[in-house]
Amino acid sequence: MPPEVRGNKRAFFDISINGEPAGRIVFSLWNHCCPRTVENFRAFCTGELGKMNGHYASYQGSVFHRVIKGFMIQGGDITHGNGTGGYSIYGRTFDDENLALKHKKPYLLSMANRGPDTNGSQFFITSEEVPHLDGKHCVFGEVIKGVEVVKAIENLETGNEDKPVCKVEITHCGEMVRKGDVVGNAGAAASEPEPTGVKMEDEPKTRNWLMRYSKSPESREEKKKDKHGREEKRDRRRRSNDRHGRDRRSRSRSQSRDRNRRRDDRSGRDGRVGRNERDDRSGRDERRDDRRSAPTKDGIKVRGRGKLTFLGGRTRSTTPPHWKREESKKLTLEAHQKRQEELEERQKRAAQREKEEAERNARLEKERVERQNQRELERQKQEAERELKRQQENEESGNRRRRRSSRSGSENDESELEEPKNRSASPRKRSSSSSSSSSSGHSSDSD
């Protein structure tokens, strides 16, 4: 689905790493696919809802609390800052909206949750394709600018629970409006007719509401005449006031000189000043000196006619909290240099660890290859031994068969030799038997 079909809203984060500006991340929000989720994220970006649940409903000042290289960066915990808090603009949590969208490319904006229908304010930005999250987390936007900032956060050193060692803070955030929309609204406002005949340039330069023009339309000529007439009257009044003021000042100076002269004459006639008058005058002088050098609340004496009276009540507006936060981030040159040295030292340690890790991986790979070669040699040796043993067994079985065949052949030869002997022995037996019978006959005859 093309981006213009998914949504047309934009939001941004201004990121700082250890108090140093790192850049801006701009998001394209898919409000056509996930309107509730996008509205929740947009409201937290603008902070338009103010305070909710005892915390300001804004991502400003929150941190990225979890960073996993090759996977994602996670933030949005506006209450605790460690991944255990947060809430939504609809309540504690709200339901999953569109789980059909896939995590099929990097730098997608998705909602973090603790299970089905537990979306709050936490979110994460993927750095790789993560299909195992499909159907579990709602994708509602993507990064369209500031990929290098996401990579910089992803490559930070992390500690326990994948928390980055450096503080990654959202210093400013909000919604972006396209220029075409602003120009269109301005043109529409300019094309609207004015409700009255009074122009902005004809309004009087006074704050008194009762001295303003009436809203009835008048001709341009009459307005100019009235304007010139008022200016002439104002000039005449100013000149007369200046003249009367000079007269009053001159009369007051002459009267003060006359009073001083009469006082001096009386003092000359009396020859001395009474004790009570001296005491009153000294008391007035002391009180005047006290008023002139009255200390303020912080103990600083201010010279003048009296104490400062404009420090009593605070009538001005208070300093905005984000100004105070920015003011607290000011660093001295020594602190900045120390921070830079610590950063360089961490970078060196990280580079050293990477080097050691690469060496260890190379060593392990070499050992693995050697073990594999050794196993291959042992396997070949065992196969050679089995083949040799098989050959020896074959030779022994052949020898046994040959011996058996030779033995059977010799037995056959012996049996063949015994048969003629038996044949030759049988006539001898017959002849011996006949001779014995004849001898027995002869013996009987002789008897």
From Swiss-Prot:
Keywords (A to Z) from UniProt: Coiled coil, Isomerase, Rotamase
Start and end residues of each PPIase cyclophilin-type domain: 12-175
CDD domains, alphabetized: ATP-synt_Fo_b
Chain spans, region Disordered: 186-447
Compositional bias of kind Low complexity: 432-447
Annotated disulfide bonds: none
A biological-process GO annotation: protein folding
Basic residues bias (residue ranges): 235-254
Domain of life: Eukaryota
EC id: 5.2.1.8
Biased composition (Basic and acidic residues): 215-234, 255-301, 323-399
Pfam family of the protein (one): Pro_isomerase
Molecular function terms from GO: cyclosporin A binding; peptidyl-prolyl cis-trans isomerase activity
Residues forming coiled coils: 326-401
Top class in the EC scheme: isomerase
Catalytic activity annotation: [protein]-peptidylproline (omega=180) = [protein]-peptidylproline (omega=0)
Protein name per its UniProtKB record: Peptidyl-prolyl cis-trans isomerase 8
Taxonomic lineage from the root: Eukaryota, Metazoa, Ecdysozoa, Nematoda, Chromadorea
